[in-house]
């Protein structure tokens, strides 16, 4: 108040090194995002991904809003493209974009629709990838960046940076499990939805929401795991001072399936009749 500058605590060498690493990883992730977007719009394989997205009701506007792209099925498309932009193999491994195998490094994400995951400031800190074609090896349907210092799911809510304005306006957030659920809700106009990315809703996520909303509506999957997760999530959200309601999607469907089948108004009706947690 008196204009006296408080000296900042000197950062240790280790802290400075961590900051530098985080900046490099985020820069690599931003480059990867742009590469995946280019693959979606400028390759034959991208047309497959566009057809898949269109089939799920995801419009070009939503693709743009969430910076959705596609990872080519080749073993080193990203490694090669980002290598030319000055990203070392070590950096791409550290960022979780490449994996070192005995045969050499390979892209971690291959043949997947790519969804960048941003922190509240809009930095890309990781990715979710949804398989485009189930193959004989039955690779996992979803693959995420592994947990690191800068990609800690407890401190992130998927879609928060794009939903924030609408959440503040409505004083309410709708919380779903997966990023595809959140994207489908945005696609039909429920653009105050965010995803906790899995069923374990965390205190850090509740605090993030409490800064923007008064009330949260949990819309987890109707299966047993989703119901158990809802019970835990309700108490965590209440501890953060949030009003809580629970939305049950009929017919055991997840929000993504329901909203694609029945549309926005039917889902708004479910929000309106959601019971207090």
Language-model features and meaning:
Residues 13-34, 74-216, 230:
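Phosphate-handling DNA/RNA-contact segment within nucleic-acid enzymes
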Residues 227-234:
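Amphipathic helical hotspot of TIR/SEFIR-family domains
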Residues 208, 235-242:
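Arginine/glycine-rich "motif VI" loop of SF2 helicases in the C-terminal RecA-like domain
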Residues 50-57, 234, 247-257:
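A glycine-rich phosphate-binding loop feature that marks nucleotide/adenosyl-phosphate handling sites
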Residues 20-64:
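Non-catalytic interaction/clamp surfaces of large macromolecular machines
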